[in-house]
C-alpha cells in the first residue's frame, strides 16, 4: 500500500536568492514558482535557465518532474540560483535512482561548461562601514 515516491530535494544559491528544487519521477515537467520555464520573464535570462537542458539534452529530463521554488535576491540572482538548483537536482536524482556512471557523466558535462552549475558562488555583499557612503568609499575631505 505504501508506495514511496522517488524524489530528491536540492538547493541553489546566488547572493541572497535561494532556489529549492524537488525532483521526482514524472513526465518531464519543469516549473519555477508554479510556472513552466517557457513563461518566465525576462526572456533574455530564460536562455540562461535552459542551459542545463541544452547541455545534457531534453531526453535526460523526460522521466523526471522538477518543481523549483525561488525567493530572495533580484531577477538575475534568482535565475542563477534556479539553474544551479536544476542542475544539482538532476545530478542528485541520477545518483540516487539511476546509476553512478550517468551521474558522473552529468557532473563532468556541467563542470566542463560552467562550474557554477554545481558549486555555489561564496561572494556576498560587503557591509557598510562608518566614515563613508559604502563599504570602501570614504566621505571627501576639505581642508578649509
Swiss-Prot record:
The keyword Acetylation applies. Residues 124-144 are annotated as: Disordered. InterPro entries: Ribosomal_Su5_D2-typ_SF (IPR020568), Ribosomal_uS9 (IPR000754), Ribosomal_uS9_CS (IPR020574), Ribsml_uS5_D2-typ_fold_subgr (IPR014721). PROSITE patterns: RIBOSOMAL_S9. The modification N-acetylthreonine is found at residue 2. The keyword Protein transport does not apply. Keywords: Acetylation, Ribonucleoprotein, Ribosomal protein. Disulfide bonds: none annotated. One of its GO terms (molecular function) is structural constituent of ribosome. Coiled coil: none annotated. Pfam families: Ribosomal_S9. GO terms for cellular component: cytosolic small ribosomal subunit. One of its GO terms (biological process) is maturation of SSU-rRNA from tricistronic rRNA transcript (SSU-rRNA, 5.8S rRNA, LSU-rRNA). Belongs to the universal ribosomal protein uS9 family. This is Small ribosomal subunit protein uS9. It comes from Caenorhabditis elegans. The lineage of its organism: Eukaryota, Metazoa, Ecdysozoa, Nematoda, Chromadorea. The gene is rps-16.
